[in-house]
């Protein structure tokens, strides 16, 4: 998957999985446009850091426009930016609703529209959503209906877009994750979180990245929700 001419746009790219994806795509020869609200400039001339709130339609449009202006094209969009809020259903607030809908759905919708317009002009492109296995297998001790609502919407949109654009050289996929060992999970929570997976451990950031890279390479795969979750979605646990 090495081609210096190709360009990937990655949201939520300042830390964790997003930061790892930036490096992985650079290692594969891609130039990268990396976005988050507070991302810092990169010393790598082939990484354009673009700060802004991806839920803002104007930011989404500018992000794709800047990618084309700087690097001449866009080949892959990874919708990695996300908010996860776990609390009892009746405890969710209007602010929780706005944050989850804004980042998880609006943050997918507007930039994906802009990217697909570009892909149509090129006759090729790939979109990947980062989702969660909680959509398929809710966990009694993890009440997170807003994650199921928003990420479930992404799963459905992934399949719908895959069919809509299959004849135009555009693939659309998603990676549904279990719990990944990122900075958002303090070390003292790891043992309890590991027990939620049949494999008995947390996923590593590299394992999430490997799922995305598999889909990037798998040219005959579209409309796929790839579970990288330690067996979580396979059955009751």
Q: Where do the model's predicted regions map?
A:
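Active-site loop of short-chain dehydrogenase/reductase
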Residues: 5-6, 73-74, 119-132, 142, ...
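Conserved glycine-rich cofactor-binding loop
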Residues: 14-15
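The beta1-alpha1 cofactor-binding region of Rossmann-like NAD(H)/NADP(H)-dependent oxidoreductases
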Residues: 51-63, 94, 207
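Catalytic loop of short-chain dehydrogenase/reductase
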Residues: 128-153, 158-167
């Amino acid at each position: 998957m090495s081609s210096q001419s190709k360009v990937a746009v990655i949201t939520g790219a300042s830390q964790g999985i997003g930061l790892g994806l930036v490096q992985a795509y650079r290692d594969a020869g891609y130039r990268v446009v990396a976005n988050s609200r507070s991302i810092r400039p990169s010393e790598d001339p082939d990484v354009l850091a673009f700060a802004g709130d991806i839920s803002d339609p104007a930011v989404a449009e500018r992000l794709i426009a800047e990618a084309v202006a700087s690097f001449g094209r866009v080949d892959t969009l990874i919708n990695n930016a996300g908010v996860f809020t776990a609390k009892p259903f009746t405890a969710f607030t209007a602010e929780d609703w706005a944050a989850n809908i804004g980042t998880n759905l609006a943050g997918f919708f507007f930039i994906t529209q802009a990217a697909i317009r570009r892909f149509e002009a090129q006759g090729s492109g790939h979109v990947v959503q980062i989702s969660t296995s909680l959509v398929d297998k809710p966990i009694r001790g993890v009440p997170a209906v807003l994650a199921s609502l928003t990420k479930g919407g992404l799963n459905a949109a992934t399949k719908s877009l895959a069919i809509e654009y299959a004849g135009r050289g555009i693939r659309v996929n998603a990676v549904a994750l279990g719990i990944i060992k990122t900075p958002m999970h303090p070390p003292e929570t790891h043992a309890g979180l590991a027990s939620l997976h049949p494999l008995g451990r947390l996923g590593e950031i590299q394992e999430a990245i490997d799922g995305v890279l598999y889909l990037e390479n798998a040219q005959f795969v579209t409309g796929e929700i790839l579970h990288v979750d330690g067996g979580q979605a396979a059955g009751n646990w």
